[in-house]
Amino acid sequence: MSGKLYLVATPIGNLEDITLRALRILKEVDYIAAEDTRNTLKLLNHFEIKKPLISNHRHNEENRENGLIEKLKEGKNIAVVSDAGTPGISDPGEVIARRAIEENIDVIPIPGACAAINALIASGLDTKEFVFLGFLPLNKKLRKEKLEEIKNETKTLIIYEAPHKIKDSLDIIGNRKIVLAREITKIHEEFIRGNIDEIIEKSENLKGEMILLIEGSHEANNENILNNLSLDEHYNVYEKQGLSKKEIIKKIAKDRGVNKNEIYQYFLEK
């Protein structure tokens, strides 16, 4: 009979956040697959847990899975942990979980801390709907493409970000309510709230990985409203704003995703 694979969430800063169930599982399993065995050893030593550790990080996860699956098939129980937080959420865990499921091995989540969720619930932004993006691509071109893709998203955005990249990210996203969360659950926990200029200014001297939370875009909602209007009604909206005919036609074309010549021809024939 196969063993079980446990995905065990661990504290993201404050060791008091570990759950009683997590401690029990870590004590009962045969092996612990850890993102960084040195970090996990500190956690285990604190709680006086002694178990064999197996290195399982993002650079060796796919190569390591065969050995882990073999142990599971032998009836051994394995706990997967990341350095902090929930395995599989921007951390190793997804690959081995998927493989275990393919092999009909039970995968059991042991809930606990997750930096993204902890930051969201204390952000003051909409928590009903949100999009978690984790780490953005390192490649500048791919990174820009991803930001352009999500800048009109109406749901709250959650991104793991480095301070020196915040300005470039926010320049593309545009001005709206923004929250920067850092050192979550630690002594120097901090939530920085403001608009784009305020956040960029306050983040210049900060260090370490942060959680960037961005209010959903209102522009997409406005575009949907405008697109439900007739062309004449759409024209009147911008005319009341004092725009020239040329400017109005350009904006209508952009709102509706059509060639501006089509809009120009419509009003020319009226």
Show where each model-derived region lies.
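Short Gly/Thr/Asp-enriched flexible loops that form oxyanion-binding sites at enzyme active sites
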Residues: 88-103, 170
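Short active-site oxyanion
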Residues: 26-32, 104-108, 155-157
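Glycine-rich, flexible N-terminal cofactor/catalytic loop recognition
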Residues: 1-56
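Loop/turn-to-beta-strand initiation segments
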Residues: 4-5, 75-79, 155-156
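Conserved helicase motor
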Residues: 56-62, 136-139
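A contiguous loop/helix-start segment that scaffolds small-molecule binding in enzyme catalytic cores
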Residues: 2, 156, 160-270
